[in-house]
Amino acid sequence: MKFIVKLQAEITIKSRPVRKRFTKILESSVKNVLRRIDEQVTTRMNWDNIEVNTKDNSPENRERLVEALKCIPGIPMFLEVQQSEFVDVHDIYEKTLAVHAESIENKTFCVRAKRTGNHDFNSLKVEQYVGGGLNQQVESAKVKLKNPDVTIHLEIKNKDLFIVTQRHKGLGGFPIATQEDVLSLMSGGFDSGVSSYQMIKKGARTHYCFFNLGGSAHEVGVKQISYYLWNKFGASHKVKFFAVDFEPVVAEILENVENSQMGVVLKRMMIRAATKIAERGKIQALVTGESLGQVSSQTLTNLNVINRVTDTLILRPLAAYDKQDIIDIARKIGTEEFSKTIPEYCGVISKKPTVKAVLSKVEEEEGNFDFDVLDKVVSETRVYDIRDIGKEAEEEIHAVDLVENIPENAVVVDIRSPEEEEDKPLELGDVEVKHIPFYKLSTQFGDLDMTKEYLLYCDHGVMSKLQALYLLDNGFKNVKVYRP
């Protein structure tokens, strides 16, 4: 099985050294991600593409590799191809006929060829010869040069013929690590997840910083989103997850800051803390999900006041986005259902927030704030390797057993998404299996028969462990994790 990964146009116009460096980084990313799926994957970097090969030609492996390639930043498009050597144009025709004869039956088609190397023919001749031959051989097919049903793509490189069997649209953007590191402030809502995704797509290795205002359940939810984003779009590179207990800071603000200034002061405290964390981690910029005018703290005046507490660059990828645009992207990338279950905590501490904060007034209110509280919570920041979030969840749910053999009368709850469940159904014979996607579990688990024992199941055990912790924290004791 072979794939040809095309380069982003913005990479191809770089200087030769930069283009080579970016392509090498992309090759490394592709290799790192795909070898998590198939250890037999090999890659080869060319000037204008990257070749990906594997000896495992099974449909299941192909599907997993295709889905992974679609989510790697820096890939605008990739091709599934059949590669072979050829003798002449007629040989190209015969090889193309063997691959595409069935696909053009009762359809209109055209042939498009790209050629590199020295040959006694040009691309147009290949298109005409192969297209004419297919038209004669497949009687029900008809040539149509504009808007055909099927376009047959051929690529010729010296003596090698690449017959494209399928073209896939990639994520686009830049390869991760071609830009510098950023620290994304995660609340768990739609905005912070989408802004993190935008920076990953742009090639920045994106670390996550969470200010906990809502207890362990809130932290579990944000960890889920952060792990999901990393695992789906950024798994080629290690990143960190920083967890800061911000409840003491909120308490200090509630006690000592005038009500209308609370929202802006809270955001300034978060930026101060994030700046210290970024400096320690040698991270070059902060990322927030703020969108201009969306809430009271996100007016131009207030954002300007918030910015004044740091010299570190603050990136706001969603500044000009409407809320519906953000939700649409969240749905597309898969974070919408996570975010639906996480309440917004930042907005609850100020009843009549100012939309035009005055810097001197804010600084006066902050004069009543005990900054030792902020220093203390920053010094106690918990730092995780994002890859260890699953392991950390396992340690935290020590009261939840991991079950290999299903007890009598126990019910298995498959918490995978409907798509995952459909692709790989969980078949357990006579055992009762309920299907409740992880993003609905928090609202639907309480409706189940509480006299029964429930075993949560997902493919890798990460989501099931995190969900078990969430249910434990909410008082449900009849929960275990099923790990066959």
Curated annotation (Swiss-Prot):
It is found in: Cytoplasm. One of its GO terms (biological process) is tRNA 4-thiouridine biosynthesis. ATP binds at L185, M186, K267, G289, Q298. The active site is at C458. The keyword Cytoplasm applies. SUPFAM superfamilies: Adenine nucleotide alpha hydrolases-like, Rhodanese/Cell cycle control phosphatase, THUMP domain-like. It comes from the Bacteria. Pathway: Cofactor biosynthesis; thiamine diphosphate biosynthesis. Its main location: cytoplasm. Disulfide bonds join C346-C458. GO terms for molecular function: ATP binding; CCA tRNA nucleotidyltransferase activity; tRNA binding; tRNA-uracil-4 sulfurtransferase activity. Residues 63-167 form the THUMP domain. Its EC number is 2.8.1.4. The keyword Ribosomal protein does not apply. Keywords: ATP-binding, Cytoplasm, Disulfide bond, Nucleotide-binding, Redox-active center, RNA-binding, Thiamine biosynthesis, Transferase, tRNA-binding. One of its GO terms (cellular component) is cytosol. Residues 406-484 form the Rhodanese domain. It catalyses: [ThiI sulfur-carrier protein]-S-sulfanyl-L-cysteine + a uridine in tRNA + 2 reduced [2Fe-2S]-[ferredoxin] + ATP + H(+) = [ThiI sulfur-carrier protein]-L-cysteine + a 4-thiouridine in tRNA + 2 oxidized [2Fe-2S]-[ferredoxin] + AMP + diphosphate; [ThiS sulfur-carrier protein]-C-terminal Gly-Gly-AMP + S-sulfanyl-L-cysteinyl-[cysteine desulfurase] + AH2 = [ThiS sulfur-carrier protein]-C-terminal-Gly-aminoethanethioate + L-cysteinyl-[cysteine desulfurase] + A + AMP + 2 H(+). Catalyzes the ATP-dependent transfer of a sulfur to tRNA to produce 4-thiouridine in position 8 of tRNAs, which functions as a near-UV photosensor. Also catalyzes the transfer of sulfur to the sulfur carrier protein ThiS, forming ThiS-thiocarboxylate. This is a step in the synthesis of thiazole, in the thiamine biosynthesis pathway. The sulfur is donated as persulfide by IscS. Belongs to the ThiI family. HAMAP family: ThiI. This is tRNA sulfurtransferase.
